């Protein structure tokens, strides 16, 4: 057989992204695009649109598990300040507010979205990450033989804690034995408690089990293992069929 080597050079396109996320995002983008973007734009689709006199690439995607859009600039061709001012003005009637990446991180964890190289990496299989439904074992693909031999059970779950916010790197113990660690954790305004992801060393039946969380300060807290996502398992929010019910 012959060998083939493919080399590709990936360049930074100098493109940066703004996200408009939340239940009013369709109305805001409809206004910003003069009606060209509306509720008929399917999820995970994209196209070029005129936003305030500038042509920009817009996708109906996001990193929040919310109804929303991402707007990609065209490098130095984009007048970023003008775009920012235009979008802020379009969002005013709908109460849109600026939020930093921390807010996005909270929402992506609440929504059960994994971060590459933080929650998942090349040392975990799709099955261990709970993403086995994306793998079609009836087809041939690179790595299939290795996956056939692997355990198909999940090692990555959600965790809730009423007395503390789980911190990345925190140890997870069951019966005084370390069985895993926290990959990411945040305070959840939706669930009114600390939440995060726990990665176990071995697959097992962990759902609804109480575990011990050892934070970096060595304090001990009780947590409960839960299935992901933490809420909206039917994805009604993404399909504009519902909104978050924040607990008071």
Feature locations, PLM:
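Conserved, structured C-terminal
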Residues: 2-3, 7-248
């Amino acid at each position: 057989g012959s060998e083939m080597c493919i080399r590709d050079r990936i360049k930074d396109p100098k493109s940066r992204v703004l996200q408009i996320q939340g239940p009013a995002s369709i109305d805001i983008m409809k206004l910003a695009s003069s009606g060209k973007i509306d509720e008929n734009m399917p999820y995970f689709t994209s196209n070029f649109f005129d936003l305030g006199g500038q042509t920009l690439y817009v996708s109906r995607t996001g990193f929040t598990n919310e109804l929303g859009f991402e707007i990609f600039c065209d490098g130095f061709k984009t007048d970023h300040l003008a775009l920012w001012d235009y979008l802020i003005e379009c969002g005013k009637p709908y109460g849109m507010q600026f939020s930093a990446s921390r807010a996005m991180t909270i929402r992506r964890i609440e929504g059960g979205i994994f971060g590459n190289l933080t929650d998942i990496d090349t040392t975990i299989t799709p099955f261990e990450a709970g993403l086995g439904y994306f793998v079609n074992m009836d087809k041939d693909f690179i790595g299939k033989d290795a996956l056939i031999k692997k355990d198909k059970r999940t090692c990555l779950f959600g965790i809730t804690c009423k007395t503390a916010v789980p911190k990345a790197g925190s140890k997870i113990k069951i019966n005084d034995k370390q069985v895993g660690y926290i990959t990411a954790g945040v305070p959840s305004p939706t669930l009114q408690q600390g939440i995060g992801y726990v990665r176990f060393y071995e697959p097992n039946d962990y759902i609804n089990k109480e575990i011990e969380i050892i934070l970096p300060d060595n304090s001990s807290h009780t947590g409960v293992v839960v299935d992901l996502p933490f809420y909206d398992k039917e994805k009604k929010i993404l399909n504009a069929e519902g909104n978050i019910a924040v607990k008071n």
